[in-house]
Amino acid sequence: GALSLCVQGLANIERAGTLTGPTSLFTLTIADSGERKSTVDNYFTKGVRDYQDEQRKALYPQVKARKREIKVWKTRHSGLLQKIKSETKQGNPIDEIKTQLAKLEDEEPRPIPVPYLIRSDETPEHLAMALRVEWPSAGIVSSEAGAVFGSHAMNPESIMRNLSLLNILWDGGELQIGRVTRESFCLKDVRLSVSLQIQP
């Protein structure tokens, strides 16, 4: 699991002439209580956890500065929209404001990507958004898989939909996420491995 997490964002594997896909793995380890599941998990994932911690610390000043830029951008964007609304009510021309708005939208700052590779308790919806916005490669890793299988995302009403989403992410396929209340988006070229341990 840890090895696939390290390489899945770097290369694909060609299994046959027309079969190419990610190196991502889904693994489930079944072990009795006291068989050191957490110890083994920590041993193999320590390097990945150390790397992502180092990256977070190194990128923190940039992330903080970018968050400020995004707040300023949102304030300016909101101000221009309010100005358009106000000028329209008064019957004034808004061409210049629309030009300013278009220019501002072209300059929208994006969050600084920070490697957040190891995840545990994730809803599929949040995982999809994180792969799009934060980092396009991740692994759901847990030595207590009961927390994953027993989560709200695995209730009878949503289990098939959520497992299908995870399967598409593992396969490296393209995934359209449609939303009514939020922005819809497309996930493409993202990578997901799953490494779970559970007691029988």
Whereabouts are the PLM-identified features?
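Phosphate-handling catalytic cores of nucleic-acid transaction enzymes
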Residues: 1-200
